[in-house]
Structure formats: C-alpha cells, structure tokens
C-alpha cells in the first residue's frame, strides 16, 4: 500500500511550483518492528552485513518530518524537536550523518539538484531502540522531497535509493506488512486481506500493540557482534533477541512480565532494547501495562496500532 496523501494541490497550480514556493510538505512515518527476524551469515559484498529473512510490521508510533524549500544555494538545515531525542540531542552529533539528511543528499544527487531544503524532525519514536526511528526519518524525508520537488517518482525507484542508505528504509517508505530478504532491503509487500496477512492475524499478531521503551540505547553493530558470539536462542523468532538481552537484561524481564500477563507475543524489537507486546484485547493490554508499571521493567510505555502507514500532508 502506498502512503496516504492528504490535501493535494490543485492540478492547475502545479506548474507554478519552484524552489521559492512557500509550500511545506509534512510526512508522518511510523516505527517498525520485526515479527520474525532470521539472521544468516555476513556477506563481504554487502559491507559485512548479515543476510536477513524477516517480516516487517509498521506500528503507529510516528516521527514527523517537515520539508520546506529554501532559496537556491542556501543549502540544507535541520531542526530536531521532541522530548525523546536521545543521542541526537548531543552537541557531538554530526547533523550530516543524520539519516534524514543522508536521504536528502541521496535524493538531491539522484534528481541532479542542490539539497536546498529546511528539514524539521519531531521525534516520538525512541532513538537507538530497534524501532527504525532513523529509517522512518529517512523514508519520510524521501517522500517529502519527492512531493516538494514534484518528482513523482514511483515507490520502487525510491526503494532503490533507500536501499543504498539502510536495510529497513525501503520498507519504511510504505509501512504496513512486508517480507524482507537480502540484508533486509528486498521488500515484498503483504497486501491487506491477503492470505499471508490473515495467517499472521491467526497467529496472534493483531489487537493492541504495546511498546516498552528505555532511556538506554543499544548499538546495532554491538548487538550483531554479540550475536556472532552467542547466536540465537532456540525458539526465538528474533535471532537477535538473546544478544540484545545479554546486553540489556531488562528487556528479557519485560518479555517475561508481558508473557505472564497474557501477551499473545512479546519480543525484542529488531536489535533492541525496546520490547513489543501484542495483546488480544483491551483487558490483556491493561494487564501488561499494569505489570510493566508495577515492576518498572520498562521506562516508557507506548500504546499503538498496527499495521500503520506513512501519511503525507501539503500546506501552503
């Protein structure tokens, strides 16, 4: 499913758009989790990245990227907002390494134009949490610039560019549910109402979605390095889970607490440390929330829906 576009510009006005237009594009892009994550061997041709076989699921926790054209030659700017910026708020953070900025540069190079765009990111997705917040920001930037510059490139072309930036960025362009292979960048969408989606629902991947988040962060390379040492635990749908828990034991405690409270599924999200729990109904969701609060095994609880999709808005 393609991103939802709201408030489209009248067709008659499109030819008037140029770099000086005051039009602003806003994209809300959801977090991602991995319902399954099988990790294979590392490949030198992929820069040492591991082979992955995963089922992506976008969940309704959104970062918002706002893009406005600047004067020609003015260059780009980046502003970060939100209460959960993590390391992004550090004065040592290089904005040119921000995922959204890298996505802007990649789009500018592909379009053969200068990246004269003002970006504002409102963060709600926890940082360094295994929820794809940086990938969501990159995907949102690509969708915004595609609209702002009136490129009208199809999703497949955007995914080709996104694959040069990160494993799950191609998925974040559309959200929903999808299979990911290669190093995670090869996307096969799972259509709403399809047999594959119904199978996931029957397995318990439906209802309320709860995210247990932490102030602490995990480095994805460190988690993969630990995985190379300890491997996957038997029965784990996420092969990185044992490695993440060894580095962040509270994640394991949160999984145990959610499971005992009646979660249909509870697991480390991606490389962690966040924990995602699916609850069949409101009562089960409330039990999980209560036990997480009572035992303090998570620092922040986010309630969300899934599957979710990006939303694109246009304002004058």
Curated annotation (Swiss-Prot):
Q: In which pathway does it act?
A: Isoprenoid biosynthesis; isopentenyl diphosphate biosynthesis via DXP pathway; isopentenyl diphosphate from 1-deoxy-D-xylulose 5-phosphate: step 3/6
The Gene Ontology biological process annotation of the record reads: isopentenyl diphosphate biosynthetic process, methylerythritol 4-phosphate pathway; terpenoid biosynthetic process
Superkingdom of the source?
Bacteria
Q: Does the keyword Transferase apply?
A: yes
| Enzymatic class | transferase
Cite the entry's keywords alphabetically.
Answer: ATP-binding, Isoprene biosynthesis, Kinase, Nucleotide-binding, Transferase
Q: Which residues bind ATP?
A: 126-136
Please give the PANTHER family that the UniProt record associates with this protein.
4-DIPHOSPHOCYTIDYL-2-C-METHYL-D-ERYTHRITOL KINASE, CHLOROPLASTIC
| Name of the featured protein | 4-diphosphocytidyl-2-C-methyl-D-erythritol kinase
Q: Source gene?
A: ispE
